[in-house]
A protein has these predicted regions:
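Acetyl-CoA-dependent GNAT
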Residues: 42-98, 172
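Conserved active-site tyrosine of GNAT-family acetyltransferases
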Residues: 140-143, 169
């Protein structure tokens, strides 16, 4: 487990699938994910099995509250490209349906994963695709971690009867 003061990151385990499914099915969360359909436990199991087969490019973690030892969220470095040393950053706090919060728990979990990506995996870039209406997450990563806007993908999401842009943000490893 990658440990901080309040939270830790451990690889996703099969017993996490129920709570991960429940969190991902929260409608306010789901609209911010690329997978917009309601997920079943069978869907989660297929995802988990695929994750096991692609461990060399997908590092997915359950965020654990170190005091209670209970899962509070999920985070990952996904689709790692080992040639250009980049990874897609995935993150949410499911506990209390926070999604993301400008609190020490969210900040510590993100910092742990960024540090792991840069210091242990020797990544050069960590990036995210976020929908333009997800201002909470966009502002969190830009303001708290100095992510920069890289690109705009026009009309890349359909939600609430209209098209929305995607914003690509990233953080470079400035060794």
């Amino acid at each position: 487990m990658i440990k901080g003061k309040k939270v830790g990151l451990r690889p996703v385990e099969k017993e996490d699938l129920l709570i991960l499914r429940d969190w991902r099915n929260i409608s306010e969360f789901r609209k911010n994910f690329r997978e917009v359909r309601e997920l079943s436990l069978a869907d989660q199991e297929v995802w988990f099995n695929n994750l096991q087969k692609t461990k060399h490019i997908n590092f997915m973690f359950t965020i654990i509250d170190l005091t209670t030892q209970k899962p509070i969220g999920a985070a990952g470095l996904l689709y790692i490209n080992w040639i250009i040393r980049s990874a897609d950053f995935s993150f949410y706090i499911g506990d209390k349906e926070k999604y993301i919060a400008h609190d020490n728990v969210s900040k510590e979990a993100v910092k742990l994963l960024i540090d792991y990506g840069f210091k242990n995996l020797n990544l050069h870039k960590i990036w995210m695709e976020l929908y333009e209406y997800d201002s909470k997450k966009i502002n969190f990563f830009i303001n708290e971690f100095n992510f920069k806007k890289d690109a705009l993908l026009r009309d890349n999401c359909f939600e609430d009867g209209r098209y929305w842009d995607s914003i690509i943000i990233s953080l470079l490893n400035k060794k």
